[in-house]
Regions:
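N-terminal secretory signal peptides
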Residues: 14-71
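Surface-exposed peri-terminal alpha-helical interaction modules
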Residues: 2-3, 86
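Mature, soluble, non-transmembrane domains
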Residues: 71-137
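Extracellular secretome segments
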Residues: 5-16
Length: 137
């Protein structure tokens, strides 16, 4: 994913969000992706790191269980959340589908959460959003 400089001036990594309306670069190296399950209405959160190798899933947690969304056996209950550390290689990109039934994906960083529509500056709608490490244009 290529985008204009995120303007961080630190020579660090950036997260790119690609939507039907363009690409938005965010100067951050870690974030939490949060959403509500469309049927069970249960909150999910994933902590991610942005690396040149791709997006690395560091920790996942869910606030309850439901059909088809059981936490894995290694999950531990901490403050009402089932938490675990997935073991998977960094991914070049993560594709997020959108559903009006579930509400929007929220990206959290620095103590604030915003919807993807708020971040990119236009409604995402039913289109997919791709997340990945920003490469130099």
């Amino acid at each position: 994913m290529a985008a204009a400089s995120a303007g961080n001036g630190r020579g660090g990594v950036s997260l790119c969000l690609a939507t039907a309306g363009g690409v938005k670069a965010l100067a951050l190296s870690a974030f939490t992706l949060a959403w509500t399950h469309s049927i069970a209405k249960v909150e999910w959160q994933e902590d991610w790191r942005v690396t040149p190798a791709g997006l690395e899933l560091v920790q996942a947690r869910v606030k309850g269980t439901g059909p088809g969304m059981e936490p894995p056996p290694e999950a531990r209950l901490v403050d009402g959340w089932f938490q675990w550390q997935p073991t998977r290689s960094p991914m070049p990109e993560v594709v997020l589908g959108n559903s009006a039934a579930a509400g929007e994906w929220r990206l959290c960083h620095g103590g604030q959460c915003r919807t993807l529509s708020e971040i990119v500056g236009h409604p995402i709608g039913a289109n997919v959003t791709k997340m990945g490490f920003c490469k130099d244009p």
